[in-house]
Amino acid sequence: MSSGTPTSSASPSESSYDRTRMRQWARGRARSAGIDRRDLLKLVAAASAAAPLIPAAASPAHAAQSLAGVVKPLPPELFTVRGTNAETNFSALRDTGLLTPADRFFVRNHTATPVVDATDWTLTVWGDGLAGGPVDFSYEALRALPAVSRTAFVECAGNGRSFFTSQQGQQVGGTAWTLGAIGTARWRGVRLAEVLRRAGIGGHAVDVLPRGLDAEVVSDGTNLGRVRRPLPVAKALDDVLLAYEMNGEPLPPDHGAPVRLIVPSWVGIANIKWVGDIEVSAEPLLSPWNTGLYRLFGPGYPAEGSAPLARQTLKSAFELAPGASFAAHRRHLLTGRSWSGGAPVRSVEVSTDGGTRWRPARLRDESRPGSWVRWNTDWVPRETGPGVLLARATDRSGRSQPATTAHNTQGYLFDAVVRHPVTVV
């Protein structure tokens, strides 16, 4: 069983990369792309102090309307609106198959969804990590390159954040996600490595920094610029996609059209949407999204925070609404999904008595890296009244979901077993 302390499942090379970048940044040796280093220091200072959760900003009546800044409709039976974001209701996934339909896929925006015409779109690859000058790729040119498809989940690093407070009584900052800030799709596109090689990436390249076309982010009066986050060149040349299709259709605007990054198993912020340019650098790069944001701060972590977050953690969710009602003395089929950024899911256990007894669930899918598995189990409740359902996954690395997750002030990487309330009548 896990100790409950968040640990990275990243390979040694990923971990050493992150820690090296952290030391370089702290000593002023890494270039902060697009923001003054003093402002980055302010972000780190702010991140070390917990702030209240940002609650859901809409009643069901409001949620039925379109959210400003989001293109697709957000009916309340499918989504819960949380600030400028939309969380998928897990109960809406019960009969959808392995892949999450685009109309049920969660939306995480830092600003408003830009609507970009693919015919006018150009991807510019530039920087001193190239052997030559900048290289442009049109949408048609990108689609003409060898294509690959990959099934992968995209999950916000803060998915499950609300349970730090509701289950563990701890204060954290950020959007109060439950477990619906995740979706799995079949992505089609071109390998980022293919584009970088055609652009002339040099052997001296160190970092690759994709940047989105959404509006600049302003936080507490500081302009952080457009969303961007560097990847180590080794990762950029590995399994990363520049995706232009989602579940066999062109990307919808809210999910990155015309082209987005897919970084399998990594935290959602690495999967930059609406990519407009990619900087290839011969020196380390940093941005607000891997210094003051998307790191672990709080008791047990260095003052400057943990290494930047990379791989996602292990979670399970029931395909049920909170407080779902069940008839006593009847057989019910409980369904859910489990996933891990570290290794494929090996097994799932379910408890219907608050954790006293556990039994194995039936896995419905072949477990694969970077995807989730569906599972089910039968339940015949005997006693009426309130109850709690629990699901606990174990992945092939041997890691299981713990009873609690070590606190961090921004509420990232919650991996503890979630208590799902139900009522038996």
Named regions from a protein language model:
Residues 1-35, 62:
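N-terminal secretory signal peptides
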Residues 28-48, 261:
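N-terminal secretory signal peptides and thylakoid transit peptides that target proteins
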Residues 49-53:
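Hydrophobic core
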Residues 54-66:
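C-terminal region of N-terminal signal peptides and the immediate post-cleavage residues
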Residues 64-425:
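Structured, non-membrane catalytic/scaffold regions adjacent to prosthetic-group chemistry
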